A protein has these predicted regions:
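A glycine-rich phosphate-binding loop feature that marks nucleotide/adenosyl-phosphate handling sites
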Residues: 258-266, 321-339
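N-terminal glycine-rich anion-binding loop in soluble enzyme alpha/beta folds
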Residues: 1-51, 173-224
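Cofactor- and metal-binding active-site motifs of prokaryotic enzymes
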Residues: 51-157, 168-170
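N-terminal small/polar loop signature for handling phosphorylated ligands or for N-terminal nucleophile
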Residues: 48-91, 205-252
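Short Gly/Thr/Asp-enriched flexible loops that form oxyanion-binding sites at enzyme active sites
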Residues: 81-94, 266-284, 425-429
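Long, internal scaffold/assembly segments composed of regular secondary structure
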Residues: 215, 219-312
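Extended hydrophobic packing segments that form well-structured cores
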Residues: 359-472
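Conserved anion/nucleotide-ligand pocket segment
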Residues: 8, 148-180, 184-187, 328-354
Length: 472
């Protein structure tokens, strides 16, 4: 996983004599911060070549760090520095910005941070603050969280999303405005026809298909061929579609994708379930790889939510449907129509352990193109569910993210047959009454990763000017 890169910019007094006296104090605090971050090892730091002590140095040093590709910038306030310098630097540098001040009585660094923050507020420049000793684990963790979130926001800008196909099954909440995405997130939307998958599937090398087929045969727990809609040859067709999709991603330099599937592909060629599973996985038959976000049914806000979660954690992300409230077990059942990252079958770094818990079932008769669905049950653990949605109110449409901390639990395998046994299942304990979820949630799809990432997602939303919605 790539590390965040943060710039470190120290601020001093604008009076030449005072600056000469105060510069060593500022430098000492810069050194403390840099040493703590380097020792921790989760962040790469780039320190400005000088300390800000004038309008010109504020502009020039901020531009210097921006040119070096930082994801965000830490403003170091160790003494009382002219607050105007922070405003000038923020106007010309690379945000998001974290104002950092030590807490000690010798010098008014905290005063400087508050004055600088007030100036940024006046200019409408949102920012974050941390005060204390950077060797304090709590202060360090706040800084690392800022850096991780800044990296997600910074690196989303300039990405390219591949919308393969169009709106699926009439789902309004799956479509987005390419102009809005560019303006708000800096993401370009590239429309690609699904026929490209079919065309490129014919070009896939047969040796690669046989390699993949043998790997699946050797490692997947069960492959339930039925002799009609799901045969070895149909599985090979799905392999070709996966390889074709990878080629489309490579040739178009895509960063994440959504694939329509229903019904053109699922009715006439095959389901895209194998692609949705192994693109999101950290492995395939060619070995270890970075998970690549693929959203089913061309749900673009799903894909963006998943991309944020993947960039934040480095982990595969679950795509799931909100399917059923199980009153008897007190769990919400999430069950996507056909596929999910197989990593969650055992949450193991060993693909063999994961795939041993996977079953490839024949696609439902609803999808006459045939092929397989990818069945598994997600292993227990603390997790975070998230979903970007949009709401129009008083003529203004705003993005918001629903964030739900939860606990994945395991139920007997036979319980899956209550809904659709062929599909992947996630059972989750929610921290609120399920009626709240059903009354307020703004989509039929949601997404999840292991771990508690609520605070990080809240910070990312603030950086993106996205509202946060949490249920109680």
């Amino acid at each position: 996983m790539n590390k965040p890169i943060v710039g470190i910019l120290g601020f001093s007094d604008g009076d030449a004599t005072a600056h000469k006296m105060l510069a060593p104090i500022v430098q000492k605090q810069i050194d403390v911060i840099v040493e703590a971050l380097k020792k921790d090892g989760r962040i790469e730091v780039i320190v400005a070549s000088d300390i800000v002590h004038s309008d010109k140095t504020a502009k020039g040093l901020a531009e210097e760090l921006k040119a070096k590709g930082v994801d965000g910038t830490i403003f170091v306030n160790a003494v009382f520095a002219f607050p105007a310098f922070s405003v000038i630097a923020a106007k010309n540098g690379k945000g998001p910005y974290l104002l950092a001040a030590p807490i000690y009585p010798d010098w008014p660094g905290m005063v400087s941070m508050l004055a600088a923050g007030g100036g940024l507020d006046h200019e409408g420049i949102d920012h974050f603050r941390v005060a204390g000793d950077f060797n304090d684990p709590e202060v360090l963790e706040k800084t690392v969280t800022f850096a991780k979130c800044a990296m997600v926001v910074s690196r989303l800008n300039g990405q390219k999303y591949g919308l393969i196909g169009g709106r699926s099954l009439g789902m309004y909440s799956s479509t987005v405005s390419m102009q809005e995405w560019m303006e708000k997130f800096g993401i370009d939307v590239e429309h690609i026809d699904q026929l490209e998958i079919v065309r490129k599937a014919d070009e896939v090398d047969e040796a690669q298909v046989e390699k993949a087929f043998q790997w699946l045969t050797d490692n997947v727990g069960k492959i339930e061929y039925n002799g009609t809609s799901f045969t070895p040859e149909k599985l090979k067709t799905q392999i070709r579609h996966y390889e074709a999709t990878k080629k489309i991603i490579e040739e178009n330099e895509l960063d994440f994708v959504g694939v329509k599937c229903h019904y053109e592909m699922s009715a006439h060629y095959c389901t895209q379930c194998l692609s949705a599973a192994f693109l999101n996985d950290p492995y395939d038959w060619d070995g270890s790889k970075e998970p690549f976000v693929c959203a089913c049914e061309a749900d673009s806000d799903a894909a963006l939510t998943m991309q944020i979660l993947k960039m934040l954690t480095g982990d595969p992300v679950i795509f799931m449907d909100v399917r059923h409230w199980d009153q008897a077990n007190g769990v919400m059942e999430f069950c996507n129509c056909g596929s999910q990252s197989t990593y969650y079958a055992a949450k193991s770094d060993d693909y063999k352990e994961n795939l041993a818990n996977v079953t490839l079932y024949p696609a439902l008769d609803l999808y006459p193109g045939g092929g397989c669905h990818v069945n598994l049950q997600t292993k227990p653990g603390k997790a975070t569910i998230a979903r970007l949605c949009r709401r129009k109110k008083n003529g203004e449409t705003r993005y918001y993210m629903t964030i739900i901390p939860c606990e994945f639990v395991e139920l007997p395998k036979e319980r899956e047959a209550l809904t659709t046994k062929e599909w992947p299942h996630v059972f989750a304990k929610l921290p609120f009454e399920h009626q709240v979820f059903l009354e307020r949630f703004g989509a039929n799809h949601c997404h999840a990763v292991y771990g508690d990432h609520v605070d990080e997602l809240k910070m990312i939303c603030r950086m993106l000017n996205v509202d946060v919605e949490m249920y109680e």
